């Protein structure tokens, strides 16, 4: 039985009452998580109506929405600040290894057939009655990740499914990799090269968010495959140390920091990764703040309050905590000095330069321009 909220009931009632043939069902991740006793964060819905019919119904029932992926038949409804993606049933009419061209359908079985894995092709109505044409519920129960139909055909439709397979295997599998799937992935791994860097990084982020990341250390096939796709993650086993520290210190290690653990070393690995994946300026600055400490010959000696205060001023509190967490994890032990510094900086406020341009101009009559900037910079350097 599904636990329903009033907002989603409103959407069900609006579409189901449209006509005797209109239907809407839960689909995909929310059902997979419910059946696996996980917390549900997003609710996806599928309907046998086309997008224009869905938008008319939402308007009629005063439900706010926006066209989030209209070319793929997706409308996002918004009720009480919650978002619900409503996607029309589809059939693939063309795939090229990256994208699919679709047509809208009325056939639930055909919509299920175009999905990647059996555990993602489960639907349920308002009362929780399942439509499960590929026995996804059973695969969840026995811990098996199975492609729908021919694995090679499904991978060739979208090569990102290789990385998606690793993510779902990590989260749901209680079985070893099937030899057939290993063989098919090895044959088709080169297809990953046509997938955009943005999609690859987004899928990696989902994989690294797994609460079963520790299992990766026991899965040589998955580690080897990740390194084939992301060769810069050469220190991938660092994430196991990170998980242990996270558990003991109750620290939140976000995606970017987890990435930095795997790519920062004494080589130009970091620079190459940041360039290759077009990482934002903000995250680049964060990475270099860590790297500048890590690459010092006597890194532990530089981790004192004087130098950390400089980082605090120029880069902010997060940069200081990143440096300390990085050092703790890389040392593979809970260093008392590092822990003490970490506690100290958690409560520190980023300082501000007590002298400004206005003071220099009014009290010392320094004219606005290059001279003022130079004097201000000298004062700042001395103060820091």
Give, region by region, the residue ranges found by the protein language model.
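Catalytic cores of the polymerase beta-like nucleotidyltransferase superfamily
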Residues: 1-384
């Amino acid at each position: 039985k599904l636990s329903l909220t009033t907002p989603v009931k409103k959407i069900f009632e609006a579409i189901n009452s449209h006509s005797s043939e209109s239907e809407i069902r839960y689909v995909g991740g929310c059902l997979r998580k419910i059946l696996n006793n996980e917390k549900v964060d997003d609710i996806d819905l599928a309907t046998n109506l086309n997008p224009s019919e869905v938008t008319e119904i939402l308007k009629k029932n005063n439900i706010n929405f926006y066209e989030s992926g209209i070319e793929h038949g997706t409308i996002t409804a918004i009720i009480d600040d919650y978002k619900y993606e409503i996607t029309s049933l589809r059939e693939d009419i063309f795939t090229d290894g990256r994208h699919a061209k679709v047509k809208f359908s009325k056939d639930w079985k055909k919509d299920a057939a175009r999905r990647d894995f059996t555990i993602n092709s489960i639907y349920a109505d308002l009362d929780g009655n399942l439509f499960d044409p590929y026995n996804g519920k059973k695969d969840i129960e026995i811990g098996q990740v199975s492609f729908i139909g021919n694995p090679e055909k499904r991978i060739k439709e979208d090569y990102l499914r290789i990385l998606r397979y690793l993510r779902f295997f990590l989260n749901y599998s209680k079985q070893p990799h099937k030899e057939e799937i290993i063989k098919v992935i090895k044959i088709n791994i080169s297809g990953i090269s046509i997938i955009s860097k943005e999609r690859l990084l987004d899928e990696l982020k989902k994989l690294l968010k797994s609460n079963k990341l520790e299992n990766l250390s026991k899965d040589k096939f998955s580690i080897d495959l990740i390194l084939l796709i992301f060769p810069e993650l050469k220190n991938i086993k660092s994430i196991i140390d990170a998980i242990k520290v996270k558990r003991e210190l109750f620290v939140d290690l976000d995606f970017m920091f987890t990435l930095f653990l795997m790519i920062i070393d004494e080589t130009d690995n970091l620079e190459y990764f940041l360039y290759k994946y077009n990482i934002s300026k903000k995250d680049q600055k964060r990475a270099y703040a860590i790297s500048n400490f890590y690459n010092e010959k006597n890194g532990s000696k530089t981790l004192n309050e004087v130098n950390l205060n400089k980082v605090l001023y120029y880069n902010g509190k997060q940069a200081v905590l990143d440096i300390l967490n990085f050092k703790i994890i890389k040392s593979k032990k809970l260093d008392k000095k590092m822990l003490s510094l970490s506690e100290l900086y958690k409560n520190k406020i980023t300082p501000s330069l007590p002298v400004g341009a206005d003071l220099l101009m009014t009290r010392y009559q320094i004219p606005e321009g290059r001279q003022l900037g130079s004097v201000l910079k000298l004062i700042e350097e001395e103060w820091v």
